[in-house]
């Protein structure tokens, strides 16, 4: 039986989007998702995202496999792509502003398609306690801020944030000088992270600008990571690398695939991410 899909990308972070609303069982197995994400033998993508019918307070549900077939709790670039996928499925017109309540394995996430086609996402609150990441780098009820971690042949100062998925953020002088193909797997599989981790290597460019490279858990080196950009802004504030302006902290996060605008509303603790999501092509899996 053939299966239709749409390919979308958000800053080069690309996904296969599948309309799964007519049944509860996901239309691809983890092994099939891994095969179709392969850029040599399959279609090529950083993950597969399934759209399911909503339940309770949600309009829709999102479920996702990473490129290695593992389950992803959430994906910032992915949920922007999903919002544009829904926008098209509903037959919306360009210029409409539409908000969706989407149930994810990280909780309820609310993306809003803007009049200019960009998508702003209420990413919710960061989780900062070691047990919430999870990590063994601090006591369960303590934050992990500028904690030393030995990876490879050097010690790194890391700050850990969960955006529904685990992130390990480290600030460096020059992100371009790092060999992520070597460092990324060493961080991802470090025993301090029992569920593995995403890792962000960040260079501070100015009072409101950060440059970030990312190694994603289950996907490897990617061109962008929305939850990682959010975690990076939080880590920059917690470590004093950036100072909030009043009750807001915000920054442009430069990624290899382009820029994301990230804002942290300190009174509510909610993070907001704004960026593009574009359809690439449609196809059919045999």
UniProtKB/Swiss-Prot annotation:
Keywords: Amino-acid biosynthesis, Cytoplasm, Isomerase, Lysine biosynthesis
UniProt-listed GO biological process terms: lysine biosynthetic process via diaminopimelate
Catalytic activity reported: (2S,6S)-2,6-diaminopimelate = meso-2,6-diaminopimelate
Pathways involved: Amino-acid biosynthesis; L-lysine biosynthesis via DAP pathway; DL-2,6-diaminopimelate from LL-2,6-diaminopimelate: step 1/1
EC number: 5.1.1.7
Pfam families for this protein: DAP_epimerase (PF01678)
Record: active site: 75 (proton donor), 225 (proton acceptor)
Superkingdom, taxonomy of origin: Bacteria
Molecular function terms, GO-annotated: diaminopimelate epimerase activity
Residue(s) at site: Could be important to modulate the pK values of the two catalytic cysteine residues: 167, 216
Subcellular location(s) of the protein: Cytoplasm
One GO location term (cellular component): cytosol
Family annotation (InterPro entries): DAP_epimerase_AS, DAP_epimerase_DapF
Residue positions binding substrate: 13, 66, 76-77, 165, 198, 216-217, 226-227
Family: Belongs to the diaminopimelate epimerase family.
NCBIfam families: DapF
Function per UniProt: Catalyzes the stereoinversion of LL-2,6-diaminopimelate (L,L-DAP) to meso-diaminopimelate (meso-DAP), a precursor of L-lysine and an essential component of the bacterial peptidoglycan.
Assembly behavior: Homodimer.
PANTHER family documented for this protein: DIAMINOPIMELATE EPIMERASE, DIAMINOPIMELATE EPIMERASE, CHLOROPLASTIC
Protein name per Swiss-Prot or TrEMBL: Diaminopimelate epimerase
Species whose genome carries this gene: Thermosynechococcus vestitus (strain NIES-2133 / IAM M-273 / BP-1)
Lineage: Bacteria, Bacillati, Cyanobacteriota, Cyanophyceae, Acaryochloridales
């Amino acid at each position: 039986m053939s299966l239709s899909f749409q390919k979308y990308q958000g800053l080069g972070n690309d996904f296969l989007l599948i309309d799964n609303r007519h049944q509860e069982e996901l239309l691809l197995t983890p092994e099939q998702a891994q095969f179709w994400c392969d850029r040599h033998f399959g279609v090529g993508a950083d993950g597969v995202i399934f759209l399911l019918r909503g339940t309770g307070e949600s309009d829709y549900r999102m479920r996702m496999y990473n490129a290695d077939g593992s389950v992803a709790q959430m994906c910032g670039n992915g949920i922007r792509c999903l919002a544009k996928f829904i926008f098209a499925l509903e037959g919306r017109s360009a210029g409409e502003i539409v908000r969706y309540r989407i149930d994810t394995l990280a909780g309820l996430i609310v993306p809003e398609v803007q009049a200019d086609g960009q998508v702003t996402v209420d990413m919710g609150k960061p989780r900062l306690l070691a047990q919430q990441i999870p990590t063994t780098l601090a006591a369960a009820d303590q934050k992990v801020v500028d904690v030393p971690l030995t990876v490879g042949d050097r010690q790194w100062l890391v700050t850990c944030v969960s955006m529904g998925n685990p992130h390990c953020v480290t600030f460096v002088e020059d992100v371009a000088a790092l060999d992520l193909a070597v460092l990324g797997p060493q961080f991802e599989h470090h025993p301090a992270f029992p569920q593995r981790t995403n890792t962000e290597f960040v260079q501070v460019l100015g009072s409101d600008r950060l440059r970030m490279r990312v190694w994603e858990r289950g996907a490897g080196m990617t061109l962008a990571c929305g939850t990682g950009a959010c975690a990076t802004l939080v880590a920059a504030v917690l470590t004093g690398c950036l100072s909030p302006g009043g009750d807001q902290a915000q920054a442009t996060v430069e990624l290899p695939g382009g820029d994301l605008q990230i804002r942290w509303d300190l009174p509510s603790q909610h993070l907001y991410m704004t960026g593009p999501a574009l359809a690439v092509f449609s196809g059919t899996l045999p």
